């Protein structure tokens, strides 16, 4: 596998990388790799389902066992990527194709993955293949999948990247490298090849990082920086994916390097950040560039730590994940060793890395999945002890990875290695370099497009804490205390902020150019924001995915999004938020480290305007994650974290000035976006309130935001979005109470949460991709989503509606997202690949959005249907969540919202949701959870889901159920109301004329004909018969006159009689017919129209039939009609019309009653008569050939 990776990587990372993009999913691969890629595609589908299972089992065994195998796997890929720039090159070529078909990755992902780790489609492969590529890279470290190593490992990486992200923190360089090999995170970062210059910058910055001590994690990692430079030069030629994957490897490799050289990185990153922001702005023009910048940031994070490997990993979209995983394994070893030397926390990270490597070795068999999960959980939980939120996220990540692993089989094993390596790498990164940890985590998370990518996002979620340089460092300190000394981590917060700024800039530059055009385009729309994000946190690949760099607020939001996205890929503020939240929950429950990240997010989110509720929830969620209620925390933290995170950045003593500055810029740019980011800030604040370390992280984030604010006109816009988002957190609690996000909390509790998060992540990625494609339009769309998320307090409907608008642009993308999410659960590689493509093209944006979504879980209302379905689904179970997301997706489709829930119950997300719809999502987030046109019921569902999100884990589950019931009830009530409306109309019709018509209703007619009321029926029958008989004797004129005289005689007589009586009695009763005179007798228009329309229909039908008969349309029918008329001539001779009417009247009032009383006998004789008639007709037809033929 390494050879395959190296040969293609060499071609793509040196100079072929640019030619490779011409391949567009056609990557130079050995036949074996192509077969493996096909198998990988199939395994990815399996992984989608298995990923959830593996994630569940992975936290315990996976963490402990995976690290060891991961290290070998990482080592091999690391050597490929680190020692030889060649391995990254193949990945570069593979990513080259992804820029064009990032979303098509499902189609080509199999072949690229099989032929080479970088073979999978750059962007699609990046998402789908991330898991696959890690497998390719992993094969050396994973003996079990050797035959299908390239295929099964490649598929596995989908799981692995997430796992490595959580487990990798201890050995950050190794895990990132593996991630680089898998291309899970960095694949997405490099999926966009549009930004050629940024790639070069990233390579230069990578050189700086390489020069820095951290870069010497190992020979492989040292090579990565140089490889990154080579890749930076050649990546532009390479496909964006190739560059992205290679950057991932570089980032993973350099991650350790950056750890020791945080100061240098900070300076470099700061400069690179400015360049990136400028280039991001420039890229904003280019859609591809925007997408690329998304990848670019996450890739930057990876390229700083393991630039060459990151690039090689990114080289292939799907293969990229495998490559990244492989690199991670290699890097895990290198990083673990280097981290041990580089930082005090390194021993812890190394220990975790060793655990994960061991787990990976054991996981080489499917049993290893459980072990890895356990192993990962152990290290993660250690991390969790210090950083509960991250631990939860890591757990979720492991669950996702485990599920993916189970689905992929051999691939899963490889993926587990990748996951474990990534996790180990993330752990060591977190321990050694929080900033790099964040970058590696985010990079790993960057690939959540695939299950692996989602897992990586769990890692990213963990790194999410380091999202902002200072905040990231603080988060790393908080998150990595488990991995290492919290004090040292806290100390590194500022350094991380600086380094991350530099890394983000460098990574953004490198990744933007290296990434696929998709990501480049996405970055163009979100370049500034991404640049700020990258500056803040190179590892925060999610940051790049967030807005393009609108303002510090946006950066902060992106950081939060990265945290959320690491946990679960939820880029769309609403749909994606839910997805992020779901994935976050998954990762939290499955990965202790992942859980730590949600907790961190919550703690940061504590200060949000929604701070009281969010803080309440965030602490609860923080405690819950440790207690296993991480599900609630993610749901609460995504929304809360989004708003609180930004608010905390805003409120932090150190951060507020930068944040205010950023907010000022953002307000100038887009007040709406600023509000959106404010909500994440609020979430950050809440998180900060939850934990002092988180507060410090928030401060770091604020600092980072300030740094990122420098390069962000777009950031300003996004920060305005953040401000819009900030009100949302205030509403977001309401929304969480009434929106899918609260449901996601319950869903997070369930193991199914990982599935929904994946869907949500995919959906977010797709939405983000759409945003990336739309560039500023997508930014606006994002703002709309955020604004909508702010609306959720109003019931979540406005949010849903606005999200519908945004989803209208991203409708197709979101649908594929949810479909991808669903496909992950359902083993649908194509959809997953689409999500991967979206993730690769908009990975950074997605991650940032995911962070924002998680930060502003309330924003889940954006895709309430999808998310709602997904979240309830998560609560119920993976299948339930998936069905809910599917149902949610269906609802969205029906609603035209296409929100994320194709079959809320069946497929949910979903959910809904999820989309989703349910998601897609309850409405569904999904959501699913993502037809933008929500039905009113769907909107209601979304609101209910949001409400549930605010609830604690248990409360969220109950609330989700209640919300689902309420969602169902509103529909039923609406139907009932509609039914009642007719009854009300009938009552209205029951004015004198209405009553008359009612009496003439079918019920009244039946009662008359069956003599239910003998008196009434007798009067009607007698009067009608007398009238007809009179007509037989008198002319109609005479009859009319006599009837009128009779009535007048009666009324006049009665009137005179009453007057005489009143005069005698001296009473003042008044006119005897006063009541009738004053009564309403007018016939309503409706009644006239009703009967006239009915009569008109009959008249028209009769006219048409007569025309057909008289014009001999059918000769036989015309002859029959002629015979009938001939018979009537005889009837007319015997009876006149009145006689026939009299006979009809008598029959009408007699036949029904007789038949009712003697039904059995009559039926018997009628049956005999019919039989005789048929027999006679058959004989006649037999004798007359023409008639027989006609009958036939």
Curated annotation (Swiss-Prot):
Residue numbers bearing the Phosphothreonine modification: 450, 858
Lumenal side of membrane: 1040-1133
Lineage of origin: Eukaryota, Metazoa, Chordata, Craniata, Vertebrata
Name of the protein: Reticulon-4
Membrane-spanning residues: 1019-1039, 1134-1154
Record remark on domains: Three regions, residues 59-172, 544-725 and the loop 66 amino acids, between the two transmembrane domains, known as Nogo-66 loop, appear to be responsible for the inhibitory effect on neurite outgrowth and the spreading of neurons. This Nogo-66 loop also mediates the binding of RTN4 to its receptor.
Cytoplasmic topological domain: 1-1018, 1155-1192
PANTHER family cross-referenced by the UniProt entry: RETICULON-4 (PTHR45799:SF1), RETICULON-LIKE PROTEIN (PTHR45799)
Designated gene of the protein: RTN4
A Pfam family reported for this protein in Swiss-Prot or TrEMBL: Reticulon
Annotated stretches, region: Disordered: 1-204, 427-458, 722-762
Species this chain originates from: Homo sapiens (Human)
